[in-house]
Protein backbone atom coordinates (compact mmCIF):
# COMPACT_ATOMS: atom_id res chain seq x y z
CA UNK A 1 0.00 0.00 0.00
CA UNK A 2 1.38 3.41 -1.00
CA UNK A 3 1.69 6.15 1.60
CA UNK A 4 -1.12 8.14 -0.02
CA UNK A 5 -3.54 5.25 0.52
CA UNK A 6 -3.10 5.63 4.27
CA UNK A 7 -5.55 7.63 6.40
CA UNK A 8 -3.96 7.85 9.85
CA UNK A 9 -6.43 10.39 11.20
CA UNK A 10 -9.63 8.90 9.81
CA UNK A 11 -8.52 5.36 10.65
CA UNK A 12 -7.44 6.49 14.11
CA UNK A 13 -10.77 8.01 15.12
CA UNK A 14 -12.69 5.03 13.71
CA UNK A 15 -10.50 2.60 15.69
CA UNK A 16 -11.04 4.69 18.82
CA UNK A 17 -14.82 4.63 18.31
CA UNK A 18 -14.80 0.85 17.82
CA UNK A 19 -13.27 0.43 21.27
CA UNK A 20 -16.48 2.06 22.54
CA UNK A 21 -14.84 3.90 25.44
CA UNK A 22 -16.93 5.20 28.32
CA UNK A 23 -16.86 8.97 27.88
CA UNK A 24 -16.64 11.33 30.83
CA UNK A 25 -15.66 14.21 28.56
CA UNK A 26 -17.41 16.54 26.13
CA UNK A 27 -19.36 16.53 23.86
CA UNK A 28 -22.21 15.90 26.25
CA UNK A 29 -24.36 14.04 23.75
CA UNK A 30 -22.07 11.01 24.44
CA UNK A 31 -22.04 9.36 21.00
CA UNK A 32 -25.60 10.56 20.38
CA UNK A 33 -27.23 9.05 23.47
CA UNK A 34 -28.05 12.45 24.91
CA UNK A 35 -29.26 13.95 21.67
CA UNK A 36 -32.70 14.66 20.25
CA UNK A 37 -33.79 11.28 18.79
CA UNK A 38 -34.93 12.69 15.45
CA UNK A 39 -31.61 14.45 14.86
CA UNK A 40 -29.64 11.39 16.01
CA UNK A 41 -31.57 9.14 13.66
CA UNK A 42 -30.99 11.47 10.74
CA UNK A 43 -27.26 12.01 11.33
CA UNK A 44 -26.49 8.39 12.23
CA UNK A 45 -24.52 6.77 15.00
CA UNK A 46 -21.35 6.32 12.94
CA UNK A 47 -20.91 10.06 12.52
CA UNK A 48 -21.81 10.77 16.15
CA UNK A 49 -19.34 8.18 17.41
CA UNK A 50 -16.44 10.18 15.96
CA UNK A 51 -17.71 13.59 17.06
CA UNK A 52 -14.83 13.73 19.52
CA UNK A 53 -12.40 16.14 21.16
CA UNK A 54 -8.63 16.32 21.48
CA UNK A 55 -8.14 13.61 24.09
CA UNK A 56 -4.75 11.89 24.36
CA UNK A 57 -5.13 9.09 21.79
CA UNK A 58 -6.51 11.47 19.15
CA UNK A 59 -3.78 14.15 19.05
CA UNK A 60 -4.35 17.91 19.20
CA UNK A 61 -4.64 20.23 16.19
CA UNK A 62 -3.04 23.02 18.24
CA UNK A 63 0.02 20.88 19.00
CA UNK A 64 0.04 17.99 16.52
CA UNK A 65 2.41 15.15 17.32
CA UNK A 66 0.45 11.97 16.49
CA UNK A 67 -2.25 11.06 13.97
CA UNK A 68 -2.99 14.69 13.03
CA UNK A 69 0.71 15.33 12.40
CA UNK A 70 0.88 12.22 10.20
CA UNK A 71 -2.22 13.26 8.25
CA UNK A 72 -0.88 16.78 7.69
CA UNK A 73 2.44 15.38 6.47
CA UNK A 74 0.65 13.15 3.96
CA UNK A 75 -1.34 16.16 2.76
CA UNK A 76 1.85 18.20 2.32
CA UNK A 77 3.28 15.36 0.25
CA UNK A 78 0.14 15.15 -1.90
CA UNK A 79 0.02 18.91 -2.57
CA UNK A 80 3.76 19.43 -3.03
CA UNK A 81 4.10 21.63 0.06
CA UNK A 82 6.72 21.71 2.79
CA UNK A 83 4.00 21.92 5.43
CA UNK A 84 0.21 21.57 5.42
CA UNK A 85 -2.02 22.82 8.21
CA UNK A 86 -5.59 21.56 8.59
CA UNK A 87 -8.26 24.20 9.17
CA UNK A 88 -11.65 23.70 10.81
CA UNK A 89 -12.33 27.43 10.38
CA UNK A 90 -12.90 27.07 6.66
CA UNK A 91 -10.68 28.67 4.05
CA UNK A 92 -11.50 32.03 5.61
CA UNK A 93 -9.47 30.99 8.66
CA UNK A 94 -6.61 29.82 6.45
CA UNK A 95 -6.67 33.10 4.49
CA UNK A 96 -6.57 35.16 7.68
CA UNK A 97 -3.63 33.06 8.87
CA UNK A 98 -1.71 33.69 5.64
CA UNK A 99 -2.09 37.44 5.86
CA UNK A 100 -1.44 37.77 9.58
CA UNK A 101 1.68 35.60 9.21
CA UNK A 102 3.41 38.12 6.94
CA UNK A 103 2.08 41.60 7.80
CA UNK A 104 1.61 43.63 10.95
CA UNK A 105 0.27 47.07 11.86
CA UNK A 106 1.11 49.71 9.26
CA UNK A 107 2.82 47.26 6.90
CA UNK A 108 1.73 47.01 3.28
CA UNK A 109 0.22 44.06 1.45
CA UNK A 110 -0.63 44.14 -2.25
CA UNK A 111 -4.06 42.69 -2.99
CA UNK A 112 -6.54 42.73 -5.87
CA UNK A 113 -9.66 44.75 -5.11
CA UNK A 114 -12.00 41.83 -5.89
CA UNK A 115 -11.01 40.01 -2.71
CA UNK A 116 -13.17 37.88 -0.44
CA UNK A 117 -14.39 39.50 2.77
CA UNK A 118 -12.09 37.24 4.82
CA UNK A 119 -9.07 38.97 3.27
CA UNK A 120 -10.36 42.39 4.25
CA UNK A 121 -11.20 41.07 7.72
CA UNK A 122 -7.59 39.91 8.10
CA UNK A 123 -6.34 43.32 6.98
CA UNK A 124 -8.53 44.97 9.63
CA UNK A 125 -7.35 42.53 12.33
CA UNK A 126 -3.66 42.87 11.41
CA UNK A 127 -3.70 46.64 10.96
CA UNK A 128 -1.99 46.25 7.59
CA UNK A 129 -2.39 48.80 4.82
CA UNK A 130 -3.78 47.34 1.58
CA UNK A 131 -2.29 48.40 -1.73
CA UNK A 132 -5.04 47.64 -4.21
CA UNK A 133 -4.49 46.38 -7.74
CA UNK A 134 -7.36 46.83 -10.13
CA UNK A 135 -8.44 43.42 -11.45
CA UNK A 136 -9.22 43.20 -15.13
CA UNK A 137 -12.96 43.48 -15.80
CA UNK A 138 -14.56 41.38 -18.53
CA UNK A 139 -16.79 43.80 -20.46
CA UNK A 140 -18.86 40.98 -21.97
CA UNK A 141 -19.62 39.08 -18.77
CA UNK A 142 -19.38 41.84 -16.17
CA UNK A 143 -17.07 39.79 -13.92
CA UNK A 144 -13.62 40.41 -12.50
CA UNK A 145 -10.69 38.33 -13.66
CA UNK A 146 -7.29 38.09 -12.05
CA UNK A 147 -4.42 40.55 -11.84
CA UNK A 148 -1.76 40.91 -14.52
CA UNK A 149 2.01 40.61 -14.33
CA UNK A 150 2.26 44.22 -15.48
CA UNK A 151 0.01 45.44 -12.66
CA UNK A 152 1.99 43.45 -10.09
CA UNK A 153 5.26 44.93 -11.35
CA UNK A 154 3.86 48.47 -11.13
CA UNK A 155 2.67 47.83 -7.57
CA UNK A 156 6.05 46.42 -6.52
CA UNK A 157 7.86 49.38 -8.10
CA UNK A 158 5.59 51.87 -6.32
CA UNK A 159 5.68 50.00 -2.99
CA UNK A 160 9.06 48.23 -2.66
CA UNK A 161 8.44 47.90 1.09
CA UNK A 162 5.38 45.65 0.59
CA UNK A 163 5.53 42.56 2.80
CA UNK A 164 3.51 40.31 0.52
CA UNK A 165 1.31 39.89 -2.54
CA UNK A 166 -2.03 38.11 -2.40
CA UNK A 167 -3.39 36.51 -5.58
CA UNK A 168 -6.80 34.92 -6.19
CA UNK A 169 -6.04 31.90 -8.35
CA UNK A 170 -8.20 30.57 -9.84
CA UNK A 171 -10.99 33.13 -9.42
CA UNK A 172 -14.47 32.13 -8.28
CA UNK A 173 -15.30 31.81 -11.98
CA UNK A 174 -12.31 29.56 -12.67
CA UNK A 175 -10.05 32.05 -14.46
CA UNK A 176 -6.31 31.77 -13.75
CA UNK A 177 -3.47 34.24 -14.18
CA UNK A 178 0.09 33.38 -15.18
CA UNK A 179 0.84 32.55 -11.58
CA UNK A 180 4.30 31.10 -12.21
CA UNK A 181 5.51 34.37 -13.75
CA UNK A 182 3.93 36.42 -10.95
CA UNK A 183 5.70 34.24 -8.36
CA UNK A 184 9.04 34.58 -10.17
CA UNK A 185 8.67 38.37 -10.29
CA UNK A 186 7.81 38.64 -6.58
CA UNK A 187 10.54 36.25 -5.50
CA UNK A 188 13.12 38.29 -7.43
CA UNK A 189 12.30 41.03 -4.90
CA UNK A 190 11.99 38.71 -1.88
CA UNK A 191 8.24 39.30 -1.63
CA UNK A 192 6.21 36.23 -0.60
CA UNK A 193 3.19 35.24 -2.68
CA UNK A 194 0.01 34.21 -0.86
CA UNK A 195 -2.67 32.48 -2.92
CA UNK A 196 -6.38 32.41 -2.24
CA UNK A 197 -6.92 28.97 -3.79
CA UNK A 198 -10.41 28.52 -2.36
CA UNK A 199 -11.76 27.35 -5.69
CA UNK A 200 -8.80 25.28 -6.85
CA UNK A 201 -8.16 22.23 -4.67
CA UNK A 202 -8.65 19.94 -7.67
CA UNK A 203 -6.35 21.72 -10.12
CA UNK A 204 -3.24 20.16 -8.54
CA UNK A 205 -4.37 16.70 -9.59
CA UNK A 206 -4.91 17.04 -13.35
CA UNK A 207 -2.58 18.36 -16.03
CA UNK A 208 -5.45 19.82 -18.10
CA UNK A 209 -6.20 22.32 -15.34
CA UNK A 210 -4.27 25.48 -14.38
CA UNK A 211 -1.09 25.21 -12.31
CA UNK A 212 -1.75 24.97 -8.60
CA UNK A 213 -0.18 27.43 -6.18
CA UNK A 214 2.42 24.94 -5.00
CA UNK A 215 3.26 23.91 -8.57
CA UNK A 216 3.79 27.58 -9.42
CA UNK A 217 6.17 28.04 -6.48
CA UNK A 218 3.93 30.19 -4.26
CA UNK A 219 4.78 30.55 -0.59
CA UNK A 220 1.34 29.88 0.90
CA UNK A 221 -2.03 28.75 -0.42
CA UNK A 222 -5.38 28.58 1.36
CA UNK A 223 -7.15 25.71 -0.36
CA UNK A 224 -10.79 24.71 0.14
CA UNK A 225 -10.83 20.93 0.18
CA UNK A 226 -14.53 21.05 1.07
CA UNK A 227 -15.49 23.08 -2.00
CA UNK A 228 -14.32 20.73 -4.72
CA UNK A 229 -12.22 18.06 -3.03
CA UNK A 230 -14.78 15.92 -1.24
CA UNK A 231 -14.38 16.85 2.44
CA UNK A 232 -17.06 18.22 4.75
CA UNK A 233 -18.13 21.86 4.62
CA UNK A 234 -15.88 24.15 6.68
CA UNK A 235 -12.80 21.93 6.35
CA UNK A 236 -9.82 23.38 4.53
CA UNK A 237 -6.03 23.34 4.37
CA UNK A 238 -3.19 25.84 4.34
CA UNK A 239 -0.19 24.78 2.26
CA UNK A 240 3.17 26.39 3.08
CA UNK A 241 6.55 26.53 1.33
CA UNK A 242 9.35 27.50 3.69
CA UNK A 243 11.86 30.20 2.82
CA UNK A 244 10.19 33.59 2.76
CA UNK A 245 7.60 32.34 5.26
CA UNK A 246 8.12 30.78 8.70
CA UNK A 247 6.08 27.61 9.28
CA UNK A 248 6.39 28.12 13.04
CA UNK A 249 4.89 31.58 12.72
CA UNK A 250 2.05 30.11 10.64
CA UNK A 251 1.38 27.45 13.31
CA UNK A 252 1.20 30.15 15.98
CA UNK A 253 -1.22 32.33 14.02
CA UNK A 254 -3.53 29.52 12.89
CA UNK A 255 -3.73 28.27 16.47
CA UNK A 256 -4.74 31.77 17.64
CA UNK A 257 -7.56 31.83 15.08
CA UNK A 258 -8.79 28.26 15.65
CA UNK A 259 -11.36 26.99 18.12
CA UNK A 260 -10.06 24.69 20.84
CA UNK A 261 -13.11 22.49 20.19
CA UNK A 262 -11.81 21.14 16.91
CA UNK A 263 -14.23 18.91 15.02
CA UNK A 264 -12.83 15.45 14.35
CA UNK A 265 -15.56 14.89 11.77
CA UNK A 266 -14.08 17.76 9.76
CA UNK A 267 -10.49 16.68 10.37
CA UNK A 268 -11.16 13.05 9.43
CA UNK A 269 -12.95 14.15 6.27
CA UNK A 270 -9.85 16.12 5.22
CA UNK A 271 -7.69 13.04 5.67
CA UNK A 272 -10.05 10.86 3.63
CA UNK A 273 -10.48 13.50 0.90
CA UNK A 274 -6.70 13.86 0.54
CA UNK A 275 -6.40 10.10 0.02
CA UNK A 276 -9.19 10.14 -2.57
CA UNK A 277 -7.62 13.02 -4.50
CA UNK A 278 -4.09 11.63 -4.35
CA UNK A 279 -5.03 8.11 -5.42
CA UNK A 280 -8.05 8.63 -7.69
CA UNK A 281 -8.06 12.35 -8.42
CA UNK A 282 -6.73 12.32 -11.96
CA UNK A 283 -9.35 9.86 -13.21
CA UNK A 284 -12.18 11.51 -11.29
CA UNK A 285 -11.27 14.99 -12.49
CA UNK A 286 -10.80 13.80 -16.06
CA UNK A 287 -14.36 12.50 -16.03
CA UNK A 288 -15.57 15.77 -14.49
CA UNK A 289 -13.92 17.80 -17.26
CA UNK A 290 -15.58 15.57 -19.85
CA UNK A 291 -19.02 16.09 -18.25
CA UNK A 292 -18.55 19.85 -18.12
CA UNK A 293 -17.29 20.11 -21.70
CA UNK A 294 -20.27 18.14 -23.02
CA UNK A 295 -22.68 20.36 -21.11
CA UNK A 296 -20.90 23.50 -22.34
CA UNK A 297 -21.33 22.47 -25.96
CA UNK A 298 -25.01 21.68 -25.41
CA UNK A 299 -25.67 24.98 -23.61
CA UNK A 300 -23.98 26.96 -26.37
CA UNK A 301 -26.36 25.34 -28.85
CA UNK A 302 -29.29 26.97 -27.01
CA UNK A 303 -30.32 30.28 -28.58
CA UNK A 304 -29.85 33.21 -26.20
CA UNK A 305 -27.38 31.50 -23.84
CA UNK A 306 -23.60 31.63 -23.77
CA UNK A 307 -21.38 29.32 -21.71
CA UNK A 308 -17.77 30.45 -21.47
CA UNK A 309 -15.07 28.25 -22.98
CA UNK A 310 -11.46 28.44 -24.18
CA UNK A 311 -12.23 31.48 -26.32
CA UNK A 312 -11.99 33.58 -23.16
CA UNK A 313 -8.24 32.91 -22.99
CA UNK A 314 -5.52 35.03 -24.55
CA UNK A 315 -5.88 38.34 -22.74
CA UNK A 316 -3.37 39.63 -20.21
CA UNK A 317 -5.67 38.53 -17.37
CA UNK A 318 -6.97 35.21 -18.74
CA UNK A 319 -3.96 32.91 -18.98
CA UNK A 320 -5.81 29.67 -18.23
CA UNK A 321 -9.19 28.47 -17.02
CA UNK A 322 -10.93 25.66 -15.19
CA UNK A 323 -13.47 24.04 -17.55
CA UNK A 324 -15.39 22.47 -14.65
CA UNK A 325 -16.85 25.91 -13.90
CA UNK A 326 -19.83 26.66 -16.15
CA UNK A 327 -20.21 30.44 -16.45
CA UNK A 328 -23.56 30.86 -18.20
CA UNK A 329 -24.51 34.32 -19.46
CA UNK A 330 -28.28 34.87 -19.56
CA UNK A 331 -28.30 38.60 -20.32
CA UNK A 332 -29.43 38.09 -23.93
CA UNK A 333 -32.62 36.47 -22.65
CA UNK A 334 -33.53 39.81 -21.12
CA UNK A 335 -33.36 38.44 -17.57
CA UNK A 336 -30.87 38.64 -14.73
CA UNK A 337 -28.80 35.80 -13.39
CA UNK A 338 -30.88 35.97 -10.24
CA UNK A 339 -34.07 35.52 -12.29
CA UNK A 340 -32.55 32.38 -13.78
CA UNK A 341 -31.44 31.10 -10.37
CA UNK A 342 -34.93 31.45 -8.91
CA UNK A 343 -36.61 29.89 -11.96
CA UNK A 344 -34.28 26.86 -11.89
CA UNK A 345 -34.98 26.39 -8.18
CA UNK A 346 -38.75 26.67 -8.48
CA UNK A 347 -39.21 24.57 -11.62
CA UNK A 348 -36.40 21.99 -11.49
CA UNK A 349 -35.11 22.01 -7.89
CA UNK A 350 -31.72 22.96 -9.33
CA UNK A 351 -29.48 25.08 -7.10
CA UNK A 352 -26.66 27.03 -8.76
CA UNK A 353 -23.46 28.20 -7.06
CA UNK A 354 -24.21 31.88 -7.56
CA UNK A 355 -25.96 34.40 -9.75
CA UNK A 356 -25.26 38.03 -10.54
CA UNK A 357 -26.84 40.64 -12.76
CA UNK A 358 -25.81 38.86 -15.95
CA UNK A 359 -24.76 35.26 -15.23
CA UNK A 360 -25.22 32.08 -13.28
CA UNK A 361 -22.32 29.89 -12.20
CA UNK A 362 -22.70 26.11 -12.06
CA UNK A 363 -19.90 24.06 -10.54
CA UNK A 364 -19.33 20.53 -11.82
CA UNK A 365 -17.47 18.08 -9.60
CA UNK A 366 -16.74 14.37 -9.48
CA UNK A 367 -19.93 14.06 -7.44
CA UNK A 368 -21.93 14.69 -10.62
CA UNK A 369 -23.09 12.30 -13.33
CA UNK A 370 -24.62 12.59 -16.80
CA UNK A 371 -28.04 12.55 -15.15
CA UNK A 372 -27.48 15.88 -13.38
CA UNK A 373 -25.89 17.45 -16.45
CA UNK A 374 -28.75 16.37 -18.71
CA UNK A 375 -31.26 17.86 -16.27
CA UNK A 376 -29.38 21.18 -16.22
CA UNK A 377 -29.29 21.38 -20.02
CA UNK A 378 -32.98 20.45 -20.25
CA UNK A 379 -33.92 23.12 -17.72
CA UNK A 380 -31.83 25.81 -19.42
CA UNK A 381 -33.35 24.93 -22.78
CA UNK A 382 -36.83 25.38 -21.35
CA UNK A 383 -35.82 28.65 -19.68
CA UNK A 384 -34.46 30.01 -22.96
CA UNK A 385 -37.58 28.89 -24.80
CA UNK A 386 -39.73 30.90 -22.38
CA UNK A 387 -37.79 34.04 -23.31
CA UNK A 388 -37.16 33.32 -27.00
CA UNK A 389 -39.47 36.04 -28.31
CA UNK A 390 -37.39 39.08 -29.02
CA UNK A 391 -33.93 37.56 -28.58
CA UNK A 392 -32.92 38.54 -32.11
CA UNK A 393 -34.45 42.00 -31.84
CA UNK A 394 -32.62 42.92 -28.66
CA UNK A 395 -29.58 45.12 -28.99
CA UNK A 396 -26.42 43.86 -27.25
CA UNK A 397 -26.67 44.30 -23.51
CA UNK A 398 -23.89 46.37 -21.98
CA UNK A 399 -22.62 45.38 -18.56
CA UNK A 400 -21.94 47.84 -15.77
CA UNK A 401 -19.37 47.56 -13.01
CA UNK A 402 -18.49 50.67 -10.96
CA UNK A 403 -14.95 51.97 -10.63
CA UNK A 404 -13.04 51.03 -7.50
CA UNK A 405 -13.51 53.75 -4.87
CA UNK A 406 -10.66 55.84 -3.45
CA UNK A 407 -9.27 54.61 -0.13
CA UNK A 408 -9.22 57.60 2.24
CA UNK A 409 -7.96 55.77 5.34
CA UNK A 410 -6.88 52.27 6.32
CA UNK A 411 -9.70 49.75 6.79
CA UNK A 412 -8.64 49.20 10.41
CA UNK A 413 -8.66 52.93 11.22
CA UNK A 414 -12.07 53.27 9.58
CA UNK A 415 -13.46 50.23 11.37
CA UNK A 416 -12.50 51.57 14.79
CA UNK A 417 -13.13 55.28 14.11
CA UNK A 418 -15.95 57.39 15.53
CA UNK A 419 -18.91 56.97 13.21
CA UNK A 420 -22.38 58.23 12.50
CA UNK A 421 -25.38 57.13 10.46
CA UNK A 422 -26.50 59.16 7.43
CA UNK A 423 -29.29 58.65 4.89
CA UNK A 424 -28.25 56.36 2.01
CA UNK A 425 -28.91 59.04 -0.61
CA UNK A 426 -26.86 61.63 1.31
CA UNK A 427 -23.76 59.45 1.71
CA UNK A 428 -21.93 60.39 -1.50
CA UNK A 429 -18.50 61.80 -0.68
CA UNK A 430 -18.48 60.37 2.84
CA UNK A 431 -16.07 57.68 4.05
CA UNK A 432 -17.79 54.33 4.59
CA UNK A 433 -17.29 52.60 7.96
CA UNK A 434 -18.82 49.20 7.11
CA UNK A 435 -18.57 46.52 4.46
CA UNK A 436 -21.10 46.25 1.65
CA UNK A 437 -20.91 43.20 -0.60
CA UNK A 438 -22.90 40.80 -2.72
CA UNK A 439 -22.61 37.34 -1.14
CA UNK A 440 -21.93 34.99 -2.76
CA UNK A 441 -19.25 35.60 -3.87
CA UNK A 442 -18.47 37.89 -0.93
CA UNK A 443 -16.56 40.51 -2.91
CA UNK A 444 -17.02 43.98 -1.41
CA UNK A 445 -18.67 46.84 -3.27
CA UNK A 446 -17.37 49.11 -0.50
CA UNK A 447 -14.92 48.47 2.33
CA UNK A 448 -14.31 50.57 5.45
CA UNK A 449 -12.17 53.58 4.59
CA UNK A 450 -13.36 54.08 1.01
CA UNK A 451 -15.08 57.22 -0.28
CA UNK A 452 -18.65 56.56 -1.42
CA UNK A 453 -19.48 57.58 -4.99
CA UNK A 454 -22.78 57.90 -6.79
CA UNK A 455 -21.81 54.98 -9.04
CA UNK A 456 -21.41 52.78 -5.93
CA UNK A 457 -24.89 53.70 -4.75
CA UNK A 458 -26.32 53.08 -8.22
CA UNK A 459 -24.70 49.64 -8.30
CA UNK A 460 -26.12 48.79 -4.86
CA UNK A 461 -29.58 49.91 -5.99
CA UNK A 462 -29.32 47.81 -9.15
CA UNK A 463 -28.32 44.68 -7.23
CA UNK A 464 -31.09 45.23 -4.70
CA UNK A 465 -33.68 45.71 -7.45
CA UNK A 466 -32.53 42.47 -9.05
CA UNK A 467 -33.04 40.63 -5.75
CA UNK A 468 -29.36 39.80 -5.32
CA UNK A 469 -28.06 39.23 -1.75
CA UNK A 470 -26.44 42.56 -0.88
CA UNK A 471 -25.10 42.28 2.67
CA UNK A 472 -22.99 44.09 5.22
CA UNK A 473 -24.53 47.30 6.52
CA UNK A 474 -26.17 47.49 9.92
CA UNK A 475 -29.31 48.79 8.22
CA UNK A 476 -30.31 45.96 5.90
CA UNK A 477 -33.06 48.12 4.40
CA UNK A 478 -30.34 50.38 2.95
CA UNK A 479 -32.11 53.52 4.09
CA UNK A 480 -28.95 54.53 5.96
CA UNK A 481 -25.21 53.84 5.90
CA UNK A 482 -22.64 54.11 8.68
CA UNK A 483 -19.86 56.54 7.80
CA UNK A 484 -16.89 58.19 9.51
CA UNK A 485 -18.07 61.07 11.65
CA UNK A 486 -17.11 64.51 10.44
CA UNK A 487 -16.40 67.15 13.09
CA UNK A 488 -17.26 70.73 12.28
CA UNK A 489 -15.28 73.61 13.73
CA UNK A 490 -16.79 75.22 16.82
CA UNK A 491 -18.10 78.70 16.08
From Swiss-Prot:
<keyword id="KW-0620">Polyamine biosynthesis</keyword>
<keyword id="KW-0456">Lyase</keyword>
<feature type="modified residue" description="N6-(pyridoxal phosphate)lysine">
    <location>
        <position position="227"/>
    </location>
</feature>
<protein>
    <recommendedName>
        <fullName>Arginine decarboxylase</fullName>
        <ecNumber>4.1.1.19</ecNumber>
    </recommendedName>
</protein>
<dbReference type="InterPro" id="IPR052357">
    <property type="entry name" value="Orn_Lys_Arg_decarboxylase-I"/>
</dbReference>
<dbReference type="InterPro" id="IPR000310">
    <property type="entry name" value="Orn/Lys/Arg_deCO2ase_major_dom"/>
</dbReference>
<keyword id="KW-0963">Cytoplasm</keyword>
<comment type="similarity">
    <text>Belongs to the Orn/Lys/Arg decarboxylase class-I family.</text>
</comment>
<dbReference type="InterPro" id="IPR015424">
    <property type="entry name" value="PyrdxlP-dep_Trfase"/>
</dbReference>
<dbReference type="GO" id="GO:0008792">
    <property type="term" value="F:arginine decarboxylase activity"/>
</dbReference>
<dbReference type="InterPro" id="IPR036633">
    <property type="entry name" value="Prn/Lys/Arg_de-COase_C_sf"/>
</dbReference>
<comment type="function">
    <text>Catalyzes the formation of agmatine from arginine.</text>
</comment>
<dbReference type="InterPro" id="IPR015421">
    <property type="entry name" value="PyrdxlP-dep_Trfase_major"/>
</dbReference>
<keyword id="KW-0745">Spermidine biosynthesis</keyword>
<dbReference type="Pfam" id="PF03711">
    <property type="entry name" value="OKR_DC_1_C"/>
</dbReference>
<dbReference type="GO" id="GO:0005737">
    <property type="term" value="C:cytoplasm"/>
</dbReference>
<dbReference type="Pfam" id="PF01276">
    <property type="entry name" value="OKR_DC_1"/>
</dbReference>
<dbReference type="GO" id="GO:0009446">
    <property type="term" value="P:putrescine biosynthetic process"/>
</dbReference>
<dbReference type="GO" id="GO:0008295">
    <property type="term" value="P:spermidine biosynthetic process"/>
</dbReference>
<keyword id="KW-0661">Putrescine biosynthesis</keyword>
<keyword id="KW-0663">Pyridoxal phosphate</keyword>
<comment type="pathway">
    <text>Amine and polyamine biosynthesis; agmatine biosynthesis; agmatine from L-arginine: step 1/1.</text>
</comment>
<keyword id="KW-0210">Decarboxylase</keyword>
<dbReference type="InterPro" id="IPR008286">
    <property type="entry name" value="Prn/Lys/Arg_de-COase_C"/>
</dbReference>
